[in-house]
């Protein structure tokens, strides 16, 4: 029920990864990456499907060998979400997966080889109508750039990116997006800021190698939050040393927090104190798990007492305000006569939320999972 985001998006060109539009005002796409052995087709497909269930828009798959490229052919046949091939060192792998229907090629300028190899990749991408991501990483810059700057700096990442943007420009190839990732928040943020002033191509955001689930989520929220709040970014990936499913959840949580792209429930819950009249923490944890399948955007406030509860409920789709034995229930900001038994609240709230989601879905107020222009 809150107003939409006040953020003005940076203007960019449009590319498509499969049917997913990227840039030029398209919704910011959430990406993740498999961490299985790509040659283990069953495990990789299972992980891709798990990512699809939590709403991923695009999945990147590492293709380190020709054997992995052959496995990718089978993986692609069993996947519906667009797949990006992550290519390092051997440009010929990019040519092979293009034959097998890959939706985007990610190349690392720091190790893909000389310009003649890039020309071959670009020619192949043009033939198959596949976009490319120029993926700059602070940990794998070209040797001459490392020697020039001594260490990764925003200027170093920018120079690497612009060197390869210029190559694609000379080849008259404009179907590409760019990333300038680093594990340091300020290095990444300042690199993206510089790049955003130089080009109008879509930008893929990420704090690379951010860390474990907790620390990596915090780093990513700070770094990507800064950039997104400035209107910078067209796709994102949260890089965690954790289950890739968590990357997708955190990515949507960041977009949801900035009101850039709503998907699923935005829980508003108090941290609790001695005033709470019911188990707020247990209620929120249970509902987050039970309602993971819902993608209907709505704000749900769960507040343990009457200090802030009524005020939050007024701007929530569904709200509950703690009171002794039975708590107040709000829908669309209006207090209802019905009250919730504090001991049975979880089941009651779940039922109310699901019923409300069905109504909103029927009214076409749902944000679709896949960002397909044809939908």
From Swiss-Prot:
It is an enzyme of class 1 (oxidoreductase). The keyword tRNA processing does not apply. [4Fe-4S] cluster binds at residues 270, 273, 305, 312. Keywords: 4Fe-4S, Iron, Iron-sulfur, Isoprene biosynthesis, Metal-binding, Oxidoreductase. GO terms for biological process: isopentenyl diphosphate biosynthetic process, methylerythritol 4-phosphate pathway; terpenoid biosynthetic process. Binds 1 [4Fe-4S] cluster. One of its GO terms (molecular function) is 4-hydroxy-3-methylbut-2-en-1-yl diphosphate synthase activity (ferredoxin). The keyword tRNA-binding does not apply. It catalyses: (2E)-4-hydroxy-3-methylbut-2-enyl diphosphate + oxidized [flavodoxin] + H2O + 2 H(+) = 2-C-methyl-D-erythritol 2,4-cyclic diphosphate + reduced [flavodoxin]. Its cofactor is [4Fe-4S] cluster. It holds the Pfam family GcpE. Pathway: Isoprenoid biosynthesis; isopentenyl diphosphate biosynthesis via DXP pathway; isopentenyl diphosphate from 1-deoxy-D-xylulose 5-phosphate: step 5/6. Its EC number is 1.17.7.3. InterPro entries: Dihydropteroate_synth-like_sf, Enolase-like_C_sf, IspG_bac, IspG_bac-typ, NO2/SO3_Rdtase_4Fe4S_sf. Converts 2C-methyl-D-erythritol 2,4-cyclodiphosphate (ME-2,4cPP) into 1-hydroxy-2-methyl-2-(E)-butenyl 4-diphosphate. Belongs to the IspG family. This is 4-hydroxy-3-methylbut-2-en-1-yl diphosphate synthase (flavodoxin). It comes from Yersinia pestis (strain Pestoides F). The lineage of its organism: Bacteria, Pseudomonadati, Pseudomonadota, Gammaproteobacteria, Enterobacterales.
